């Protein structure tokens, strides 16, 4: 979000969901919220959460949300990395590989060994085999670096790009290892694996008027207050007349 006193600032938005309970939205600008953990804790308590109950936080990898949840609960929290963001990083590797396969004339080095590993990546991560995914990324990186020495400059650039992408993805997986799960198993159990529903909440709370593309400037405190009102309105905490005024 764009600010008029600082160039930009971060707002945390999310949803608290529990089976059999109405969804509660929460949002805040942490830099100005006096007790940010209290806002989330209130939403958890409203959902029937009690001290010691397990809590799962699904995020895009930003450490701010799981840290806030741990502060609010005062206990351990299962943090899950959103499948969509993880999948997109695999897609970037697949795109580079497809570009290499489409080259004419084809590269001197055979692409089969790397292509097999690239095609396995998504399945390995989906099935919870994160160590095997890292091994595959390591093999692709080594192969691409070696293959770059055998080809013309145009092909070399593609090979080095593939090596760089794979090295970055391996580092990303290793950094977030504690938040990676068997997504297939969780999905089959009917449990969420993505932040997509929460991202819809972001679109509801951070309306067009607060979008940086509208060139409007907000102070962190002003944005924090507006977000609190919008969350309360969307959760039905105000009467009909108040909703008309605040929408």
Where are these regions (language model features)?
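Catalytic center-proximal scaffold of phosphoryl-transfer enzymes
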Residues: 1-247
């Amino acid at each position: 979000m764009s600010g008029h006193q600082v160039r930009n600032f971060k707002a945390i938005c999310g949803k608290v969901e529990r089976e059999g309970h109405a969804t509660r939205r929460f949002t805040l600008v942490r830099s100005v919220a006096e007790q940010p953990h209290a806002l989330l804790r209130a939403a958890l308590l409203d959902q029937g959460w009690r001290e010691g109950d397990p809590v799962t936080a699904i995020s895009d990898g930003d450490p701010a949300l799981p840290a806030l949840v741990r502060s609010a609960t005062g206990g351990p929290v299962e943090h899950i990395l959103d499948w969509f963001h993880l999948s997109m990083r695999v897609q970037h590797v697949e795109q580079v590989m497809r570009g290499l396969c489409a080259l004419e004339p084809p590269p001197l080095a055979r692409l089969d060994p790397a292509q097999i590993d690239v095609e396995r990546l998504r399945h390995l991560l989906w099935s919870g085999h994160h160590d095997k995914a890292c091994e595959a990324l390591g093999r692709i990186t080594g192969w691409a670096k070696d293959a770059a020495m055998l080809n013309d400059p145009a092909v070399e650039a593609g090979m080095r790009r593939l090596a760089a992408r794979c090295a970055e993805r391996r580092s990303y997986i290793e950094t977030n290892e504690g938040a990676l799960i068997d997504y297939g198993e969780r999905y089959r159990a009917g449990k969420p694996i993505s932040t997509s529903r929460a991202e819809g909440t972001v679109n509801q709370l951070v309306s067009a008027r607060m979008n940086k593309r509208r060139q409007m400037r907000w102070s962190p405190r002003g944005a924090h207050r507006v977000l609190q009102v919008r969350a309360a309105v969307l959760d039905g905490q105000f009467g009909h007349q108040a909703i008309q005024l605040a929408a």
